[in-house]
Curated annotation (Swiss-Prot):
The active site is at 51 (nucleophile). Homodimer. This is tRNA pseudouridine synthase A. Formation of pseudouridine at positions 38, 39 and 40 in the anticodon stem and loop of transfer RNAs. Keywords: Isomerase, tRNA processing. Substrate binds at residue 109. Coiled coil: none annotated. GO terms for biological process: tRNA pseudouridine synthesis. It catalyses: uridine(38/39/40) in tRNA = pseudouridine(38/39/40) in tRNA. GO terms for molecular function: RNA binding; tRNA pseudouridine(38-40) synthase activity. CDD domains: PseudoU_synth_EcTruA.
Length: 269
């Protein structure tokens, strides 16, 4: 049988999602725990591989097993065997044609900035700290030119291995909640470092270092060297993955869970 899981993790101490030799990864920890509960070796597939230091509240994975367990037994057993910074949020048996990556229709990320004179001691690894004055409204305005199906060459990592730079961004909102600035973005898929590169460029607009029109000029230039710096990994969260409605996968609050979903720009769209 095939089982899908919703996963949350703090990526601070991991060298990314993907299993690697001699360094810790989220995938390796999950496969180790799953293999223990299933009592056989388990290999997993995910909806989106996150980089070192990047977090998730809405990662989705699937695996195949012949072990018979209730959904609650999988959840409780896994959470008892996983490290404290990885947790299972839901479990559901799915059809064998389901694939965590290829069945997905969209991904959604949030980038959380703590905009304050002083760095935070609590949540320090879960936000990106900027002490400069930042205008979130200008960032939001500048980002609207990124909506639609477009060539995002200017915002892809130099080493990105995707065959095409074209992506379809269906939602982009930047809002402020007290000292927190949240960039909320959804697309059919993302290029390597795309969200962090967009964030880094929008921050230059928010700080008054570049005009609002600059983002549209960057998009048209198709040149990564002209864009802003890559924003730090610690503020980025994979918060949701969309699937066809007929799959009836659980829908939970997007997170990060300490961020009020009632805040402007962070509710469901």
């Amino acid at each position: 049988m095939r089982i899908a899981l919703g996963i949350e993790y703090d990526g601070s101490r991991y060298f990314g999602w993907q299993r690697q030799r001699e360094v810790i990864s989220v995938q390796a920890e999950l496969e180790k725990a799953l293999s223990r509960i299933a009592n056989h070796p388990v290999s997993i597939q995910c909806a989106g591989r996150t980089d070192a230091g990047v977090h998730a509240t809405g990662q989705v994975i699937h695996f195949d097993t012949h072990a018979i367990r209730s959904e609650s037994a999988w959840t409780l057993g896994l959470n008892s065997n996983l490290p404290p910074d990885i947790a299972v949020r839901w479990v559901k048996e799915v059809d064998e044609t389901f694939h965590a990556r290829f069945s997905a229709t969209a991904r959604r990320y949030r980038y959380v900035i703590y905009n304050h004179n002083y760095r935070p001691a609590i949540l320090g690894s879960g936000v990106s700290h900027y002490h400069e004055t930042i205008d979130a409204a200008l960032m939001h305005l500048a980002g609207q030119c990124l909506l639609g199906e477009q060539d995002f060459t200017s915002f892809r990592a130099i080493g990105c291995q995707s065959k095409t730079p074209w992506r379809n961004v269906t939602h982009l909102c930047v809002s402020r909640q007290g000292p927190y600035i949240v960039l909320d973005i959804r697309a059919n898929a993302f290029l390597h470092h795309m969200v962090r590169n967009i964030t880094g460029s929008l921050l230059l607009v928010g700080q008054g270092l570049k005009p609002v029109e600059w983002i549209a000029e960057l998009l048209a230039a198709k040149d990564r060297n002209q864009a802003g710096p890559t924003a730090k990994a610690g503020g980025l969260y994979l918060v949701d993955v969309d699937y066809p409605a007929e799959l009836a996968l659980p829908q939970l609050p997007l997170g990060p869970l300490w961020l009020p979903d009632s805040a402007p720009g962070t509710t469901s769209f």
